[in-house]
Amino acid sequence: IGGIAAGMSAAAKFKRLSPNDDVVVYEKGDIVSFGACGLPYYVGGFFDDSNEMIARTPEAFREAGVEIHTKHEVTNVDFSNKKVTVKNLNTNEVLEESYDKLMIASGARAIIPPIKNIDLENVVTLKSMDDGNKLRELMSKEENKKIAIIGAGFIGLEAAEAAKHRGKEVTVIQLQDRVLQEVFDKDITDLLEEELRENGVNLLLSETVTELIGDGKVSKVKTNKREIEADIVILATGVKPNTDFLNCDEIKMIRNGAIVVDKYGRTSVEDVYAAGDCATINSLITDR
């Protein structure tokens, strides 16, 4: 289930190890084997061909014997009977598929924070290829000079670098008092913050965005301390695993919906595995 990164890696590896077995992939979107980590650099103009983020096409996988169905969404998993329910998004046809082993690699989606007027034009996320194409187009317009980024995690800071590479005025607004606070100690984040400011990024820490302002299209970001002019607002407030189609009473998850796996990628359900943004990771230090 899912053919972006982890799913296609698993499919390709399994087919190499067991060439006589059927490997079937259902992907909700229309592309597979996509490296989303390249999005900020594509948006920033570090390279121009979006195909550089695609490792292999569906046709290449099919030639290798992997059966791929794009624009097909898995809507339910019956773990007891080892069946998945799939909807063809082109025809709305619903079908059932049985499995012997199941890999869940449904990824994650960008979190949309509960901010007033979040649906104004030029307010974007950066998670999918469509997001990247949209933001790249907006960034290429001369009139879009001021970029506000809400969130100072990996995506937020990489988006800041991309915008600066485009010659934009960049403001990063972070709820916490440090960038990447959940990832690095203060010694490291102090260096990151210094680097950001030296490169002209307006870094606003310990501020809460309360409202977006604009007449159809965003023009300002309002925080608990000030208003900032913005032609584009990038939402970089984290991601949520795409596991809503699963019954949490049947498969173990943590609070945010990520599927719990062991160091072999096994879930709490026999013959079911998970990997990628929809799953937890196993710590090499704690072995949990």
Regions found by a protein language model. Give the residues of each.
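Beta1-alpha1 glycine-rich phosphate/pyrophosphate-binding loop at the start
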Residues: I1-K71, A160-F184
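Residue-level detector of alpha-helix initiation sites
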Residues: I4-M8, D30, A108-A110, D130, ...
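A Rossmann-like FAD-binding core segment of flavoenzymes
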Residues: N20-D22, A64-N90, E97, H165-K263
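Active-site substrate-recognition segment that forms the wall
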Residues: K28, F154-L175, A258, R266-T286
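N-terminal Rossmann-like NAD(P) cofactor-binding module of classical short-chain dehydrogenase/reductase
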Residues: M103-I104, I234
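Glycine-rich dinucleotide-binding loop and its adjacent helix/turn
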Residues: I104-R166, N202, R255, V261-K263
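FAD-site-proximal beta/loop scaffold in flavoenzymes
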Residues: D119-E143, G216-K220, E227-R288
